[in-house]
């Protein structure tokens, strides 16, 4: 999966040669928290330390605290985000914000190579490397109140911008 996006230069456009990554579901998501900047500032070092400790990232990053068997990986590939939610790795209300609710009904994990399973198993729940990142931000200014309300955003709100994808498993597929 990859793509080039070109926009009309007469309209101030640009060419983006890598607007979409080549691992499945590579992309950027915005997590809107219930916290405000005032809530966060006194605890920012504590938050940064926790993120470094709890979110494995970088080349070769793996989860050591969570491991899935091949059978479980096949179930994840078939049932999608719902499988993870049922086991406490997410919130039911979040599934409705994922494309196709995080599941493709026609997915067939039997078509996935052994190499993809080997690469993917230790990487589930990791951020990755390269241009993947996790960035804690806050809403500094709201320019369109109606749009902000629709997205559940408000001035001073802490958000987390996450760029990740399916890593080795998705790359192999």
Residue ranges, per PLM feature:
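Glycine-rich, flexible loop motifs
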Residues: 3, 7-10, 14-19, 24-149, ...
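A conserved active-site cap/scaffold subdomain adjacent to cofactor or substrate pockets
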Residues: 155-173
């Amino acid at each position: 999966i990859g793509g080039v996006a070109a926009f009309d230069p007469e309209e101030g456009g640009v060419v983006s040669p890598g607007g979409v990554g080549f691992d499945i579901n590579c992309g950027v998501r915005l997590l809107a928290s219930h916290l405000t900047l005032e809530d966060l500032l006194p605890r920012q070092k504590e938050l940064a330390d926790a993120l470094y400790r709890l979110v494995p990232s970088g080349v070769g990053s793996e989860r050591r605290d969570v491991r899935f068997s091949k059978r479980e990986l096949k179930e994840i590939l078939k049932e999608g985000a719902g499988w993870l939610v049922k086991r406490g790795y997410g919130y039911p209300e979040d599934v409705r914000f994922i494309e196709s609710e995080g599941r493709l009904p026609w997915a067939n994990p039997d078509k996935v190579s052994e190499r993809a399973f080997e690469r993917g198993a230790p990487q589930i729940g990791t951020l990755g490397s390269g241009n993947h990142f996790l960035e804690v931000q806050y809403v500094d200014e709201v320019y369109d109140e109606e749009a902000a309300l629709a997205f559940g955003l408000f001035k001073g709100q802490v958000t987390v911008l996450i760029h990740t994808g399916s890593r080795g498993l998705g790359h192999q597929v």
